[in-house]
C-alpha cells in the first residue's frame, strides 16, 4: 500500500486525500489550523457553498477581471465533476437560488 502525505487541509488537500484513498493509498493530511476545511465551512453564510451549477461560460464571465484564464482548468475539472465526486462519496447536494450548490445538510 502506498503512503501519501498531503500538506494542507483546505478544499484541494481534502479532495486530494479522497482521490488518493480511492486508489488505495494510506493518506495523512497535515494541517496547521485546528480544523481542516474551516474556510469551506464559512462559505455561503456558514452553509458551505460548494460550487455554482450554472453553465461554465456564465461562471467564467462572472469572475472579476479576466476569468478566461480559468477556462482550461475548469474544463478539466468542472462544477459538475465536483458535485459528482462529492455525491459518489456520500455527500448529498442541493441547488438553490442563483444556481448555488450546498450540501443537503447545510454544513
Label every model-predicted segment.
Residues 13-15, 36-39:
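Short N-terminal binding/cap micro-motifs at the start of the first secondary-structure element
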Residues 2-29:
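N-terminal Rossmann-like FAD-binding beta1-loop-alpha1 element of flavoenzymes
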Residues 1, 24-25, 44, 69:
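Generic structural signal for short, solvent-exposed loop/turn connectors between secondary structure elements
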Residues 32, 38-107:
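Conserved N-terminal/central alpha/beta ligand/cofactor-binding core
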